[in-house]
Amino acid sequence: MNLQNNQGKFSKEQFSKERFCQLEDEQVIEMVHVGDSDALDYLITKYRNFVRAKARSYFLIGADREDIVQEGMIGLYKSIRDFREDKLTSFKAFAELCITRQIITAIKTATRQKHIPLNSYVSLDKPIYDEESDRTLLDVISGAKVMNPEELIINQEEFDDIELKMGELLSDLERKVLALYLDGRSYQEISEELNRHVKSIDNALQRVKRKLEKYLELREISL
């Protein structure tokens, strides 16, 4: 009985694959939108490994790897649901954006709920060089050039990635200093709380800047 069921399932999967594999993803999505459940199953199966590959880039303290994958699958489903032909991008690019955003949103929500201090994200709009400067982490990443909408989307993904990697880049002292600084503390207040000289606080923030710039350079080379 089980063998017959498995054979039937296999035949259905084969039929679905043969039915859709010659079509563009955008055509399959049109079929999903008119209620074709086989078309939905086909896209979910097709992109499952893509989701797993994206999930490997992220981590969440206290969570299983499959939790991240499941969030990615939710993002994939949303991309299928929300994609429209008039979008000026391919479905795969749109799906990647939705998957990444879903994973990042889940991680940020979880870290806030667990009250984990700056283990994975920081504000990119806070001045970083010194208290008299209005230059921010955002400026370091984007530079002075005027960005078009497509570049803004790409850079937003970069920002999210940097936020999640920040905990790996910085030392314990640098994370503490940056967390307090982003919380609005002055150099003097940070030095008193951490029992460090003001110069040590300034040096820590300078190292944060250099590490971030180095990371961005290496990331650019690898792309």
From Swiss-Prot:
State the span of motif (Polymerase core binding): 67-80
UniProt-listed Pfam families: Sigma70_r2 (PF04542), Sigma70_r4_2 (PF08281)
Residues annotated as DNA-binding are 187-206
Signal sequence interval, chain numbering: none
Which branch of life, at top level?
Answer: Bacteria
| Keyword Transcription regulation found | yes
GO molecular-function term, one example from the UniProt record: sigma factor activity
PROSITE patterns referenced in this protein's UniProt entry, alphabetically: SIGMA70_1
What keywords does the record list, in alphabetical order? DNA-binding, Sigma factor, Sporulation, Transcription, Transcription regulation
What is one GO biological process annotated to this record?
Answer: DNA-templated transcription initiation
Membership in a protein family: Belongs to the sigma-70 factor family.
Q: What does this protein do?
A: Sigma factors are initiation factors that promote the attachment of RNA polymerase to specific initiation sites and are then released. This sigma factor is involved in the transition to post-exponential phase in the beginning of sporulation.
Report what the protein is called: RNA polymerase sigma-H factor
Q: What organism is listed for this UniProt entry?
A: Bacillus licheniformis
- What would be the name of the gene that encodes this protein? sigH
